[in-house]
Swiss-Prot record:
Keywords: DNA-directed RNA polymerase, Magnesium, Metal-binding, Nucleotidyltransferase, Transcription, Transferase, Zinc. This is DNA-directed RNA polymerase subunit beta'. DNA-dependent RNA polymerase catalyzes the transcription of DNA into RNA using the four ribonucleoside triphosphates as substrates. The lineage of its organism: Bacteria, Pseudomonadati, Pseudomonadota, Gammaproteobacteria, Alteromonadales. One of its GO terms (molecular function) is magnesium ion binding. Mg(2+) binds at D460, D462, D464. SUPFAM superfamilies: beta and beta-prime subunits of DNA dependent RNA-polymerase (SSF64484). Zn(2+) 1 binds at C70, C72, C85, C88. It comes from Shewanella sp. (strain MR-4). One of its GO terms (cellular component) is DNA-directed RNA polymerase complex. Zn(2+) 2 binds at C814, C888, C895, C898.
Amino acid sequence: MKDLLKFLKQQSKTEEFNGIKIGLASPDLIRSWSFGEVKKPETINYRTFKPEREGLFCARIFGPVKDYECLCGKYKRLKHRGVICEKCGVEVTQTKVRRERMGHIELASPVAHIWFLKSLPSRIGLMLDMTLRDIERVLYFESFVVIEPGMTSLERGQMLTEENYLDALEEYGDEFEAKMGAEAVLELLRAIDLEKEIEQMREELPSINSETRRKKVTKRLKLMEAFHTSGNKPEWMILKVLPVLPPDLRPLVPLDGGRFATSDLNDLYRRVINRNNRLKRLLDLAAPDIIVRNEKRMLQESVDALLDNGRRGRAITGSNKRPLKSLADMIKGKQGRFRQNLLGKRVDYSGRSVITVGPTLRLHQCGLPKKMALELFKPFIYGKLEGRGLATTIKAAKKMVEREVAEVWDVLDEVIREHPVMLNRAPTLHRLGIQAFEPVLIEGKAIQLHPLVCAAYNADFDGDQMAVHVPLTLEAQLEARALMMSTNNILSPANGEPVITPSQDVVLGLYYTSRERINGRGEGMYFMSVAEVEKAYATGAAELHARVKVRITETVIGDNGERTEQRRIVDTTVGRALLSQILPAGLSFDLVNQNMGKKQISKLLNTCYRQLGLKDTVIFADQLMYTGFRYATISGASVGIDDMVIPAEKYTLVADAEAEVLEIQEQFQSGLVTAGERYNKVIDIWASANEKVSKAMMENLSTETVINRDGVEEKQASFNSIYMMADSGARGSAAQIRQLAGMRGLMAKPDGSIIETPIVANFREGLNVLQYFISTHGARKGLADTALKTANSGYLTRRLVDVAQDLVVIEDDCGTHEGLTMKPLIEGGDVVEPLRERVLGRVVAVDVMYPGTEDVLAPRNTLLDEAWCDKLEEHSIDEVIVRSVITCDTDFGVCAACYGRDLARGHLINHGEAIGVVAAQSIGEPGTQLTMRTFHIGGAASRASAENNVQVKNSGSLKLHNAKYVTNTDGKLVIVSRSSELAIIDELGREKERYKVPYGTVLEKLEEASVEAGDIIANWDPHTHPIITEVAGSIKFVDMIDGVTMTRQTDELTGLSSIVILDVGQRGSAGKEMRPMIRLVGADGSDLMIPGTEVPAQYFLPGSAIVNLDDNAQIAVGDALARIPQESSKTRDITGGLPRVADLFEARKPKEPAILAEISGTISFGKETKGKRRLVITPADGGEHYEEMIPKWRNLNVFEGEKVERGEVIADGPEAAHDILRLRGIHNVANYIVNEVQDVYRLQGVKINDKHIEVIIRQMLRKCVITSAGDSEFLEGEQVEVSRVKIANRELVEQGKVPATFERELLGITKASLATESFISAASFQETTRVLTEAAVGGKSDNLRGLKENVIVGRLIPAGTGYAYHKTRNDARAKKDEPVVVNKITASEAEQNLADLLNLAGSQD
């Protein structure tokens, strides 16, 4: 019966588990793990190489050294298994138990665990409410602590130095007890009554007023509750028993020459054992106190070093001055257990080799060298050889393969057929870095790669290497074929556009084919079909570029899928007609009837995919490639030095610029301009000269004039090779051609400033030594930048993946009605991103109506595809509310409707799709293309003259957004609100452009008026800020006393006098409290009110305001009472590129953030303190007013008496994301981060869908702070996952209790990763020690929800195909958890049940 049970136990070894709990180990638990106590520091006998008894490698404790053989050799072989040898005490079993059997050391004196002592905040310190400094002094025997005060005046936990202790002893005798060392701390911890303490603290919390004290108590309360609920005991933070790691995990390996290589842990354990034994001896001898104390301190230090070397004091070093690697070092960092062995493993059945081009391959194939294939597919070959009876045993098969017999190759062909392999190129930045192909056997040793997948791999053939992996199991092969095949990865997951677009040679070939040339041989011929064109081309009757007329046949596919043929005659060229042969049926000929540049080809493939689906697109892409290569070869496009045509005008342009520079130089020498102005002017002159030269050059290159058949001059695009390469998008750009044939232009110094003498030469003319030297700066900086960039970009990707890794689609629809409002992105009047691109592939959250009616155009929950977007554009909708992951209500994960279309597949996203990782990869992958630098606004850019008007680009009608205005005497509108915007609407009601206009803008047109393109419709003075009156009347000066609060200045030229208000700092003591203002009064002298309010019309004047009016003057509505000079804001460095993206995702506060209004209300200024102004906002409803101190030098946008809305900008600057979230809500912060990140990527021409950024933002917003706890378990001010609060609140509401209220919090990605619910994921990211300490104290359990945790414990991930597996498991578990009725059974029944169980277990295996 016992054997049966043992067998059962072995059966259920791979028990399914659903979580991992971490906690503190009690001394008894450690003893229960142990197989014996390690008493001696010896390791192995250096003569016999046998482990020493009771030593660190003892066979009796840890198990036999050889399989099924005891140490003395009495029992050998399998038949004795389980016997314990009576001579040497070793159990006869497998030697692998030495990897799992632990030992222990009984410590002679307790020792504090350094993690709970030193990991901040110190858990032991928090528990005892003592400072870390004090506890350390007790532990390391520097002072005493009172444990039992007895009847004395001492307090428990009071520190006593040696002298104080002796004094107390004299005074009180043995009334009290005080100790030092870990024993003292142990007793203090043991004496804590958790329940009582918790109750006490919960009671005193509400009455605490001081913020710091409250925080401290809350922290302590949380710790105590964690201990209480998890069942950990505080005294377990002090070790009495030390576990010993199994010996095979800290091996001792003999090297040749009689030396040993050993794990550092053995040294560390040896020190502990030595000191422990010495301490035991000293205690037995009753040695003097001071010696024992010293030994105890040394023991404490050696245990510290074993657990975490270097955490306290100097690290213990080995013989070679290198710090020893402790247990903590084993798990943390890039080389630690987590990142080296659990998250990244080496893989068998893999090989790597150099890659080369396979231009004849199909898209789903790769060329695999025979040698590699033979090695990789060995087991399959052996199996086949045996199955065919060609070899009798595996050994024979092995021999055959080694000899490379002819049959082996036949078998290999068969094995490889339909067996995909995976190709990977490092660095794998996104999921397209590993794709599956069908291998084609080739001679040679290099892997052949299909040219079209190079873009996805970012591969080129200059020596890149790639790795091959073989999917072994049937499931793996199936997944490789169905999901990872290169033909299934045509669209990029980052933006949904084709990623297999042709580039370089292919583009050049197709472009060359589709160009037209005037007077080409065969021009003007008529052809009845494309076949006839082909004959004419083949016989040489017509050349490739001749303009001809051809009758073509097109297949049109209707909405219901029926195909109809249409014939028409088109004007085209021979080349384009030939291209139409490979065009799949159902695509219009117009798609190829144009110059086929890279953009056009990409669009062609995209159209093909959307209209005809995957299969046709793949075949078409291959055909395009073959055609492109063929015609690129035929074209013979090559670059010769004469192709770089230098424009004749260059020399005159350069001479003109030099003359201008001389003129400026003279002005500078005669003192008319400053050095800075001169420098800026010179740079401007050269920059514009360069522009002119390059313009002349491009005009010269791009067209040539020919005489056509009718004898008339006609311009045609040039066939210059360099121009064709740039124009088609195959290689090079206008900027590069400019350096070849124009002039190199201005160069930068290493510090980023521009050198004012440009390089006038170009590469064709050649550079002289100085010019070459100047050029080297930029080149070197570029290389240094690239190296830094790669590391930074990789780290950003890692943080992004870590924060988003557990986000998976888990349901169809969460049912939320919330969403984000999408409008076209308009900047400075231009539409940067039309609405179509922003909503394509998203789901509608709120019905979209036909404009101006109540009819629904697109109902809620519609997935907007291309056809729907066409419809929206047709009805000129310019605002759609779409579902977003940020507003998704699913608890753990998101729903498909909130995510929308799977960009790489083009349909609604599937369950189990790991959208978090995809988002992180999409944002991180282009990271290396972003720049690293911060831009200094200087030179040409900074003097972009301040804008002072709006000139419209499109005709339409004028519309104002959140603007208040008054009409002045000229009948023009004057804006009197901030953050107003002015938009131009076309006749369909679509917004074409939008501009921000400041306070005091004068509009030339009324609202709704029609404007023509090019009209100037708004003017303002950029250098002063007016104060506009909203009522007419006569003015009264209040508190404006000459010489006290103001001075009069007279302009010498005009003789006009004006009043200047003095700044508070410049006034005498009399004027400090005065508030100069202008009051408006009616004819009878009574106060006038601002229209629509009870507020008297009075305008406060800030310091340095200029008033051009006299007291009692009459004014009209819309007049300026005063002007405040604006200092141009200091030139700030604009952080760009990668650092900017990192700052946004880390939610870092900018240096001088914009100050936003915390509440809505009226502005006033209170009493000033030195260097600061006191800003007061009084709400209209008479609630609590809000005060804020603002430094004097900040440029405020608001004036006394103005009304502001909550979240409005008070002082300019970069806005902080946290402020936006707090004051304007979640939608605004999402929009802000998305737009800011997109700006950086757009600048580099990288397209990323907004969805991906939103996914990361959702993860940044997943925590919240409890504002009031209601009836919940949460503490006020506690940081909790939003989903947990929502679940708890739902339960509370169901029970009719008060739910908790919370405020969302924005965390940077690093913080958010570390704050995740899963401690395994957080520990494997960063700060391993801190995370594990916290988790252990709280007794946290990890439910293994995310991908990372599951990879670490070695399971399928709960995403993709693993999602189904986990789902079925969870469903089964839910079923199993239903309560079961238990009946008592007899012993015989139990035996019968056991037998059944065994049969069942056997059948399941």
